Swiss-Prot record:
Molecular-function GO terms, alphabetical: ATP binding; ATP-dependent protein folding chaperone; isomerase activity; unfolded protein binding
Annotated PROSITE patterns: CHAPERONINS_CPN60 (PS00296)
InterPro entries the record matches: Chaperonin_Cpn60_CS, Cpn60/GroEL, Cpn60/GroEL/TCP-1, GroEL-like_apical_dom_sf, GROEL-like_equatorial_sf, TCP-1-like_intermed_sf
UniProt cross-references to Pfam families, sorted A to Z: Cpn60_TCP1
Role according to the record: Together with its co-chaperonin GroES, plays an essential role in assisting protein folding. The GroEL-GroES system forms a nano-cage that allows encapsulation of the non-native substrate proteins and provides a physical environment optimized to promote and accelerate protein folding.
Protein known as: Chaperonin GroEL 3
Provenance organism: Rhizobium etli (strain ATCC 51251 / DSM 11541 / JCM 21823 / NBRC 15573 / CFN 42)
Organism lineage: Bacteria, Pseudomonadati, Pseudomonadota, Alphaproteobacteria, Hyphomicrobiales
Known EC number: 5.6.1.7
Amino acid sequence: MSAKEIKFSTDARAHLLRGVELLNNAVKVTLGPKGRNVVIDKAYGAPRITKDGVTVAREIELGNKFENMGAQMVREVASKTNDLAGDGTTTATVLAASIFREGAKLVAAGMNPMDLRRGIDLGVSAIVKEIQARARKVKSSGEIAQVGAIAANGDATVGEMIAKAMEKVGNEGVITVEEARTAETELDVVEGMQFDRGYLSPYFVTNAEKMRVELEDPYILLHEKKLGSLQALLPILEAVVQTGKPLLLISEDVEGEALATLVVNKLRGGLKVAAVKAPGFGDRRKAMLEDIAALTSGQMISEDLGIKLENVTLYMLGRAKRVLIEKDTTTIIDGTGEKAAIQARIQQMKAQIEETTSDYDKEKLQERLAKLAGGVAVIRVGGATETEVKEKKDRIEDALNATRAAVEEGIVPGGGVALLRAKSALTGMVGENADVTAGISIVLRALEAPIRQIAENAGFEGSIIVGRLTGRNDHNQGFDAQTETYVDMVEAGIVDPAKVVRTALQDAGSIAALLITAEVMIADIPARNPAPAVGNGGMGDMGY
């Protein structure tokens, strides 16, 4: 075990704070409509240009191990907010840095960190309740477009495209974003389906950055039973390898030797393969496999139908243009199934819904019907260069996540106004002692941080903007950094999803409170570089 370096108390928190500030300074410049871009060097290919906070945060790794701990903790805030709400990562980072900065000062002044933490928790939960109470449900397609446009940094065409996509496949429908082969960005609705099962092993992942499996033009094998051994599968696996196409295996389960063999083949590059469990249970599983078979023009391999695995041919496998598999979901896009077969399946389900008397069965049939009939909306992102396409794709994915969050929990005034106005929930709030009250005040001050940063990125003094807005009684009044005017944010279409604002504050408060209560830091002592090797004696002058 290597020797460790230990830092205590104020020294430990000072190192943490330096790391937090370095990460915050890199991320905060992207906030708001006039936020700047960040250029990230890549090991191969052109540098990446992005305005996405979580992408910037994920790239940061500091040389000093103690400072790096602080940076990684706040990076966790950005990642967690992104996972839960899909947007608001920069806001979460700015809030976390503000709460920790103020908290570290008060701990250094002799206040009790545990009491401060209690105050922060009280303040955050009061603000969350206030945000939820003020949230307004999203009703129209126009409001959905507004949310999308704001999340895409003021790009109205992106907002409109997302609103159209939601109109076509429904608010709960499947919408995917992929790179186009042309310069235009377009929306297309294709036959497809999503179900709640993810990859059986992370070794199947093909896109490590997004931790997902992306299969282009794959064969799809649908098997009703568990797979424990691959012996029976070998003939069809060899046939798929000959085609050079990937293979998706959907079965009740893939266990032990079979899973290990597939993983080894994938890692060695012999066979592009991924395996997922079939959705549903019992008879419902069989029905869903038949739905997928209709969608992909494949055949379900079932011994009830007299088909054995060893006799399967390529013609029995389904096909699709693209399959995306994440940790918990699988999306099949543009299956090659015939429209007539899919329609027949849909009609059969509608008839079953009419006939069934069980509410539970009816609900499950309606779920299956929605999955099969809804299709998948695909937004194909175009651009002049690969760098532009990647940057635009980041923004559209952010906007899509924000719109889903808005539909889920409603909207609040954007541009940092919702947090600033929610300060009223903490006015006069007192803790059980002075230190708890100081913790509440930390949150009170932090609520101004996002709007200050948006103003500063637009070239204004943040405190002047905050001062002017605080003096106005209208809760929707805010500063539009794009036009540099004071407007009614909701009327101007500058809105944020309540879920994004709430999640950003909760995650920031949680991590910052943990950092404030840190008293000791432990890290490996960096290894000293060994002295350079000395040349053999007596060989100094060899006549060169």
